[in-house]
A protein has these predicted regions:
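A Rossmann-like FAD-binding core segment of flavoenzymes
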Residues: 62, 68-94, 98-101, 162-259, ...
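FAD-site-proximal beta/loop scaffold in flavoenzymes
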Residues: 111, 116, 122-138, 233-281, ...
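Beta1-alpha1 glycine-rich phosphate/pyrophosphate-binding loop at the start
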Residues: 3-71, 152-179, 192
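Residue-level detector of alpha-helix initiation sites
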Residues: 11-12, 110-112, 150-152, 276
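Phosphate-coordination loops involved in phosphoryl transfer and adenosine-cofactor binding
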Residues: 2-4, 77-78, 140-142, 196, ...
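Glycine/small-residue-rich loop that forms an oxyanion/phosphate-binding "nest" at active or ligand-binding sites
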Residues: 75-138
Length: 305
């Protein structure tokens, strides 16, 4: 069986692509990786989704998934392993099956950027986390550090304070990059800001016991007792799948797309956080997914596939 579209990724970009595909009466399957969560699922609070201010990320994800399935989008929990060309068509291999498609939409999102400091790998899952929404509750009444200065770091710090953790937010610059809304909330909170400081090491025995922080100006090192560390310093694109068919990426690894979300390979599109579009938001990922589906429809018609 040949599908019109195979969408790789079941986050906001992938699900929206699926929705717009079925509205065009196309045969589409959306493949969600069961081993990872989308950034939407991990989001503590989504303040910029129109009509639903303050919605929790998992709630928005559940509603979007339900919407897609209600319209008839086939969503499968399978990990995509490879894309390969087959004449004018494509084959997507997963850990369970192979899918032949006229077009492919890559919506694999991005992965958490690591701090790359001693102890990070050793204590992953033993005090080091990249998702406060997932692991936050176990740190109630304990000391935690959130590393980063953007929106994600700010929301993690606010969430950890709400949970009841003694929270420090550590950022390398003299002011946060987070939007004003979150900065104002942090000022009203009990979150301790440690600015002009970088994480140098995570220490412990079986679990995290402390972190070493360096002042960027004085170079002084300080050992601070901690039970948990949440790393929130951005993401790197999950764009490896496209390399097998020759898809071009930029210097940071993001998939290069044009205004139609088409990659350098005709018939393969990319949408969401894995693309090289500058704005990384849930709402823009959804928009890119809709464009990719519409343009895939046009590509199939024009190529007479």
């Amino acid at each position: 069986m040949t599908h019109d579209i195979v969408v790789i990724g079941a986050g906001p970009a992938g699900l929206t692509a699926g929705i717009f595909a079925v509205r065009r009466s196309m045969d589409v399957v959306v493949l969600g990786d069961p081993t990872s969560m989308s950034t939407m699922e991990e989001a503590t609070l989504v303040d910029d989704w129109p009509g639903m201010p303050g919605v929790a990320g998992p709630e928005l994800f559940a509603k979007m998934t339900a919407h897609a399935k209600k319209l008839g989008v086939l969503v499968k929990q399978e990990k995509a392993l490879e894309i390969r060309s087959k004449g004018k068509l494509f084959v997507v291999k997963t850990d369970k099956a192979e899918y032949e498609a006229k077009t492919v939409i890559i919506a694999t999102g991005a992965k958490h950027r690591k701090a790359m400091v001693p102890g990070e790998e050793k204590f992953a899952g033993r005090g080091v986390s990249y998702c406060a929404n997932c692991d936050g509750p176990i740190f109630k009444g304990r000391k935690v550090a959130v590393i980063g200065g953007g929106d994600t770091a700010a929301t993690y710090a606010l969430l950890m304070e709400q949970i009841g953790a003694e929270t420090s937010l550590i950022h390398r610059r003299d002011e946060l990059r987070a939007v004003d809304t979150y900065r104002k909330e942090l000022k009203k909170s009990k979150v301790k800001l440690i600015l002009n400081s970088v994480l140098k090491e995570i220490k412990g025995d079986k679990m995290v016991k402390s972190i070493v922080v360096q002042d960027v100006n004085t170079k002084k090192l300080t050992d601070i007792p901690m039970d948990g560390v949440f790393v929130a310093i951005g993401t790197v694109p999950a764009s490896e799948l496209g390399k097998n068919v020759g898809i071009k990426t930029d210097e940071s690894g993001f998939i290069i797309v044009d205004r139609s979300q088409m990659t350098s390979v005709p018939g393969v599109f990319a949408a969401g956080d894995c693309s090289n579009n500058k704005t990384k938001r849930i709402v823009t990922s959804a928009a890119e997914g809709s464009i990719a589906a519409e343009m895939a429809y046009e590509h199939i018609r024009e190529a007479e596939l």
